[in-house]
Amino acid sequence: MTITKFILLFIVTSISGIGAATEEYQTHRPLIASTLVGLALGDIKSGVMAGASMELVALGWMTIGASVPPDPALAGTIAAILTIIGKQNIGISISIAIPVAVAGQILQIVQKSTIDVIIMHWADKFAEKGNTAGITAMHFLTGIPSALRVAVPSLMVAYFANVSYVQIMLNKIPKPITSGLQVASGFLVVVGYAMIMQLLNIKELLPFFFIGFLATTFSNITLVGLAVLGGSLAAIYYFYFIKDDNRNTGRSRRVKTADLNSDAVNVENELNEKNESIKLNRKDLMKVFWRMQFYQLSWNYERMQNLCYCYSLIPVLKKLYKTKEDLSKALKRHMEYFNTHQFTVPVVLGVNAAMEEARANNEKIDNEMITGIKVALMGPLAGLGDPIFWGILRPMTAAIGAGIALGGNIAGPIIFFIIINIIRLIMRYYGLIISYNQGVNMITSIKDIMPKIMKTVTVLAYTVMGGLVAKWTVINVPVRLYSYRSNGKLITVTVQQQLDAIMPNMLPLCFTFFIYYLLRKKVPPVLCIIGLMILGIIGYSFGILK
């Protein structure tokens, strides 16, 4: 490996490491991370193919609350490096990348519970002094260990994979293991599908999963066509089963609003009578918007998104509070514990910006009201953001991109990158602007509309997931049942042929629901993956699987 490739590999793996911390641009997803590695090493096609296969395995790997999955960034970079430099087939590369990703999960937990906590406490000292530049610097300082956490292991694997005796050792792995792992790579994807189904968990909508499955099994529908089918079914479900419920929304809204605490209602009244002496404008809100592009970089295990949130709100606080003392109080107020889904956090930021504006104009809003609104919103928004964005939109777009990329088509990762970032930017912008304009009224609006949106999008997700089970899960049982002669030719009938005669793709469907059952019984996804890898090796060794 040349010095140029070494430097490029360091840069792209660092980008993926920072992406794993922020989860903004999705550069940490295997489909993107492997493509970047392929670009750095001069073999884009192999990188795209490795990333597509790894992405389908890792579809269900998502960060929810304090729960950290195996590191998808490391999985993607290692899979591509072993495929390109180590000259291994993709199945072997994925099988090695998965345990490395589990080790990366441990590294991330250590980083976020030690290094990033220390840096966050340094930010506390800057908040005490009213030093916004210091807080900003601490937020971005956490990006260094995040970058190195992925870059260093990736470079080590690249170095050793390039050494001749390591390649000889990899090539001497017994064929039953290498071929068995290759066989297992065909059905490891069911773990990701099952994880997403567990997150969605709306049983009355499961029939749409079977619609997608059957449509793909008995037709030549493409992934784009599958998405259109899912979107059409979602539209039908909304207009015929959900939209009519909106008639009752107006009747119940007052009742729902009454359920909010009295402080929130009082805040709303205060916000409607804003003093024009200090007024936030679109330029101020756009500063918050641009800061959100690296929102979750400084997430830590002690106070989670506190530094992220404070860093994002700094432009608003600097404009509203002119003295160091007032600014320091505001900064410390937003350095308290906070955590929600990063794509829905603009809603909280917008409401808080409106409240801080009212407070700066001497209206009757205290620290407890501002903090109380944050606490009241963060749970429901996380509960909606995780399934909608991580459980539906990201895996759906990633699966479509991966499906296009399996043959080495770079359009796959590009399409995924563009679509997911358009969704992200729309949510960031309008979530912030609308919530600022509505103030505390936003709470009622969210409670009314988000559950309906979730059910509608879940119809789309189930349809696509069902189709993916049929399209990308490969299980072949070549065991011979019997033979007979027809027109002088010997015809052999296998178990797979008999199963296909009953219903094609029966085994992929059964495997998916079996893993879904195990996950609901609290079996860790990593153990499911390891179990399927062992099944692939044993099945191939005894001639049961091919």
Q: For the regions a protein language model found, what residue spans apply to each?
A:
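Helix-coil boundary and interhelical linker segments in multi-pass alpha-helical membrane proteins
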Residues: 1-7, 37-48, 82-97, 402-414, ...
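Helix-loop-helix junctions within the multi-pass membrane cores of secondary transporters/permeases
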Residues: 94-189, 319, 325-466
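Loop-to-transmembrane alpha-helix initiation sites
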Residues: 93-95, 219-232
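Soluble N-terminal domains of membrane-associated systems
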Residues: 247-367
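Membrane-interface helix termini and inter-helical loops of multi-pass transporters
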Residues: 162-176, 474-496
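Juxtamembrane boundary at the C-terminal end of a transmembrane helix
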Residues: 230-235, 536-546
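Hydrophobic transmembrane alpha-helices
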Residues: 1-74
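Generic transmembrane alpha-helix motif of multi-pass integral membrane proteins
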Residues: 31-42, 83, 210-216, 513-519, ...
